[in-house]
Amino acid sequence: MTITPQNLIALLPLLIVGLTVVVVMLSIAWRRNHFLNATLSVIGLNAALVSLWFVGQAGAMDVTPLMRVDGFAMLYTGLVLLASLATCTFAYPWLEGYNDNKDEFYLLVLIAALGGILLANANHLASLFLGIELISLPLFGLVGYAFRQKRSLEASIKYTILSAAASSFLLFGMALVYAQSGDLSFVALGKNLGDGMLNEPLLLAGFGLMIVGLGFKLSLVPFHLWTPDVYQGAPAPVSTFLATASKIAIFGVVMRLFLYAPVGDSEAIRVVLAIIAFASIIFGNLMALSQTNIKRLLGYSSISHLGYLLVALIALQTGEMSMEAVGVYLAGYLFSSLGAFGVVSLMSSPYRGPDADSLFSYRGLFWHRPILAAVMTVMMLSLAGIPMTLGFIGKFYVLAVGVQAHLWWLVGAVVVGSAIGLYYYLRVAVSLYLHAPEQPGRDAPSNWQYSAGGIVVLISALLVLVLGIWPQPLISIVRLAMPLM
C-alpha cells in the first residue's frame, strides 16, 4: 500500500510523538539534563496537539487496514495528549527531589502516549492489541519508578503479572473470534457476524475472553483487584496517567469496536456487561467509603466511574446520544482527575519518600493553602456529580441514555452509586476546612500557583466550573467527532 502525503498528515500526532521519543532517547544518551528532556517532551506533546488541526483539515480516512483517522480518533487522541502533557508537567517538580535517573520517566510517558494514540485510531483487533501493549509496558516501569520504596516495587510487580495474564486472555479471545469470523478488522467483523452467528459458542467464548482482558485494563469488577494497590504504590504523577490516559484510550477503542462490530446485539454479552457495570458501580463506591488514603479512594472511585461509562456502552445500539454521553463524561472525568491527582502531586513534590496520600495530610489545608483547597473541593464536587460542575453534565447524560434505552436497574445503580459517592467525596472536601493539625505533615510550596503544575491544576478547575455552567462548547466538539464515524 502506498502512503500518500494525505496519509502522513492524518498520522501527524503519532509521527510527532514517535519522533519526540527518538529525540529524547538520543538526548539522554548524549547528556543527562532533566530540564532539557522535560522541555523536549512537553514541546513534542504540544506539537502533536496542535497537529490535530491539520488532521481535521485532511478529513476522515482509512490510513492502513489497521487504522482509521476521523473525528472520533481526533477527540480521543486529544484527550490522551492532554493527560500525557499534564503527567509530564506534574512529574517535573516531583522528580527534582528524586536521586536516581530522572530522564527515563519522560521517555516512558511518551511511549505510553504513543500507545494511547494508536488505540484512538485503531480499526483492527491487531492494532487494538498493539496499542494496549504499547500503553501497558511503559506503565510497568512507571508504576515502580520509585523502586527504593517497597510499596512502589510491589505495585509494579502486581501490575506486571496481572497485566500479562489479562493480555493472554485478550489474545486468546481474539484468536477464537478470528477462527469463527475469518477477519480481525472491525468493519469486516460487522459484516461477517450476522444475527445468527453472534450466538455461536466459539464466538461468545472469544468475546467473553476479550471482555476479561479489557475488563482488567479498565479495572472493572471482578477484574479490579490490582487497582487500589497500584494507585497507592505508584508515584502521584503516574497515578494521574493510569487514571486518565490509559482508561480513556482503551474505552475509546472499545466504543469503536462495539460501534462497527455488533457485539452488543448479543443478549448474552449485554447481560454480562450489565452485571459487570452494576457490580462496578456499587462495589467501587462501597469500597471507597472506608478509605483513609486519597489515592486508594480515587482508585476505587475510578472503578465506579468506568461502571457508569459501561451503562452508555450497553445503550450504544439505541442511538448516537450514548456516544455523545461517553465523550462528555470522559472529558469531565479527565479534567476532574487531573485536578485531584494534580493536587496530590503538588503536595508530594519534590520527592521525599512516600507521597502525601493520607487524608490526614489534607486536614485543614484551607487555612494555609486556600486556593489549593478550593481547587480540590471543586474536583471532589465534580467527581461526585454536583450541579454547576462538568461531572454533573456527564452523569446527567449517562442517566438520560440509560432511561432512553430502558436500562432501569442500571439507572437505579447509577443513582444509588452517586448517592454513596457523595458521602466520601464530601468527606474529603470537608476535611480540607477542619482545624489544621498542630504538626502539619507534607505541604505544597508557597508559590505553587506559579509553577507549571499549579497552572495545569488551576486551568482544570476553571474548565470544570465553566463547562459545568456552559457545556455547549464541549458538546459541540464531541458532536463534531460523531458524524465522521
From Swiss-Prot:
Catalytic activity: a quinone + NADH + 5 H(+)(in) = a quinol + NAD(+) + 4 H(+)(out)
Source taxon at top rank: Bacteria
Topology term for the membrane: Multi-pass membrane protein
BP-aspect Gene Ontology terms: ATP synthesis coupled electron transport
Coiled coil: none
Main localization (coarse): membrane
Assembly with partners or alone: NDH-1 is composed of 13 different subunits. Subunits NuoA, H, J, K, L, M, N constitute the membrane sector of the complex.
Protein name: NADH-quinone oxidoreductase subunit N
Originating species: Escherichia coli O7:K1 (strain IAI39 / ExPEC)
